[in-house]
């Protein structure tokens, strides 16, 4: 892709947008930037030394290339108008792809992406394989280009917001963990959301690998949409070729990998994450023994079923990354019962009724916070006692005051965080600060 002299506009100046602007400028593009926020509310943007304007429809005129950040809707009217006039509109992943050296593992799914991406990178790193991890976590892809190596691997977490803007980006190993309702406030329908996730496999070529969940009907359907060799994983049935859970044993391509009890992160969904990561690592050239050793040394990713503290016999777990109903269901499945579950935040257009049965079985109460509290209360009423806690601090303190030894306070909100927090990380950090500030009960 030739960028020298190209008139480029970057839309949305958070982390990804800043990285895209820097990347374009280094390659000789004539770069401008825009955002809904004014310049003084955008850290680091003023230091870029490029023209900036607060976003209006007129700002989008006169460019050869427009790069919207992942948080900018692809169907934004000025972007649609630009495409109608032949302007190339691509995301940061597509922008970086032609310049990225080495081979790429692309990991998507509604839940488990960050854990599986981190685990895959950890396995490769522990095995001595040159690797860097980024995308939707850590480094933006454009920031990975300079450090990429011809003999290395780039392990990328890819969200639907990123996949929405790819056209030619190719993952040598593509991986879909699951596809369940999420981001319907952005993508409008589940069918559209699922189709966007599937773009990861449509750009693959013969000789690539598509690693798919044999238990997920959407993932199964992706197999017909790719030219890659399909590899399956399942925690419930035997699959071939691929990885499966047989009793308590993880089997990879017909050979014992490890015992399920050796996996240091809790939950059946994390067994599936390990199976998927093991296939990817194996196809990247890592032997069984090295994969198993790396899995044993892996530690839970922050804000993903993260143990925080035990106080007066009560455990506290931070799963702030559980921003969808399905993610919360997986979190509930990881515990036997005695749960005080904190739910709520910014609604993403999801149906919370699926939480009713597991809450009835496992929860002492649901503590509701944030903008979605009313909707959640309506949809799970009668399933479990409800507490209108309003704030995270109120929820934690109420749960601890009423919890008995052996109980667990679980933050698994099933919602986005942006009503009360800057991000799910901010929400998780706040939860941990509150929990670590609790005094023992008399």
Swiss-Prot record:
GO terms for molecular function: ATP binding; UDP-N-acetylmuramoylalanine-D-glutamate ligase activity. Disulfide bonds: none annotated. ATP binds at residues 109-115. Pathway: Cell wall biogenesis; peptidoglycan biosynthesis. GO terms for cellular component: cytoplasm. Its EC number is 6.3.2.9. Keywords: ATP-binding, Cell cycle, Cell division, Cell shape, Cell wall biogenesis/degradation, Cytoplasm, Ligase, Nucleotide-binding, Peptidoglycan synthesis. The keyword Plastid does not apply. Its main location: cytoplasm. It is found in: Cytoplasm. The keyword Cytoplasm applies. InterPro entries: Mur-like_cat_sf, Mur_ligase_C, Mur_ligase_C_dom_sf, Mur_ligase_cen, MurD. GO terms for biological process: cell division; cell wall organization; peptidoglycan biosynthetic process; regulation of cell shape. It catalyses: UDP-N-acetyl-alpha-D-muramoyl-L-alanine + D-glutamate + ATP = UDP-N-acetyl-alpha-D-muramoyl-L-alanyl-D-glutamate + ADP + phosphate + H(+). Pfam families: Mur_ligase_C, Mur_ligase_M. Cell wall formation. Catalyzes the addition of glutamate to the nucleotide precursor UDP-N-acetylmuramoyl-L-alanine (UMA). Belongs to the MurCDEF family. This is UDP-N-acetylmuramoylalanine--D-glutamate ligase.
């Amino acid at each position: 892709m030739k960028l020298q002299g190209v008139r480029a506009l970057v839309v949305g100046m958070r982390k990804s947008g800043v990285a895209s602007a820097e990347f374009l400028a280094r390659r000789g593009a004539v770069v401008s930037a825009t955002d809904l926020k004014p310049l003084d509310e955008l850290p680091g943007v003023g230091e870029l030394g490029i023209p900036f304007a607060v976003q209006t429809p007129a700002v989008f005129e006169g460019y050869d290339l427009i790069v919207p950040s992942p948080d900018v809707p692809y169907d934004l009217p000025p972007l649609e108008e630009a495409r109608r006039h032949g302007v190339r509109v691509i995301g940061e992943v597509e922008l970086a792809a032609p310049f990225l050296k080495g081979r790429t593992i692309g990991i998507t799914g509604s839940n488990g992406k960050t854990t599986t991406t981190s685990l895959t990178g950890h396995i490769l790193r522990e095995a001595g394989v040159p690797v860097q991890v980024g995308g939707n976590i850590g480094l933006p892809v454009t920031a990975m280009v300079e450090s990429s190596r011809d003999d290395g691997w780039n392990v990328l977490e890819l969200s639907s917001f990123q996949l929405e803007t790819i056209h030619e980006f190719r993952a040598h190993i593509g991986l879909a963990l699951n596809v369940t309702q999420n981001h319907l406030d952005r993508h409008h329908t589940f069918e559209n959301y699922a189709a966007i996730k599937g773009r990861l496999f449509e750009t693959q070529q013969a000789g690539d690998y598509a690693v798919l969940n044999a238990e997920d009907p959407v993932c199964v359907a992706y197999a017909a949409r790719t030219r890659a060799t399909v590899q399956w994983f399942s925690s419930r049935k035997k699959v071939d070729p691929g990885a499966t859970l047989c009793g308590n044993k993880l089997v990879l391509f017909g050979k014992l990998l490890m015992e399920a009890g050796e996996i240091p992160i809790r939950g059946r969904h994390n067994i599936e994450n390990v199976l998927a990561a093991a296939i990817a690592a194996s196809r990247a050239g890592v032997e069984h023994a090295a994969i198993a050793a790396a899995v044993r040394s892996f530690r839970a990713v922050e804000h993903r079923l993260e143990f925080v503290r035990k106080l007066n016999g009560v455990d506290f777990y931070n799963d702030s990354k559980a921003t969808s109903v399905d993610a919360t269901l997986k979190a509930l499945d990881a515990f036997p019962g005695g749960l005080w579950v904190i739910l709520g935040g910014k609604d993403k257009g999801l149906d919370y009724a699926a939480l009713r049965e597991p809450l009835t079985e496992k929860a002492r109460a649901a503590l509701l916070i944030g903008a979605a509290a009313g909707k959640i209360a309506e949809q799970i009423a009668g399933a479990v006692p409800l507490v209108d806690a309003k704030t995270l601090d109120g929820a934690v303190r109420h749960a601890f005051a009423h919890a008995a030894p052996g109980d667990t306070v679980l933050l698994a909100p099933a919602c986005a965080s942006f009503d009360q927090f800057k991000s799910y990380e901010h929400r998780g950090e706040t939860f941990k600060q509150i929990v670590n500030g609790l005094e023992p009960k008399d």
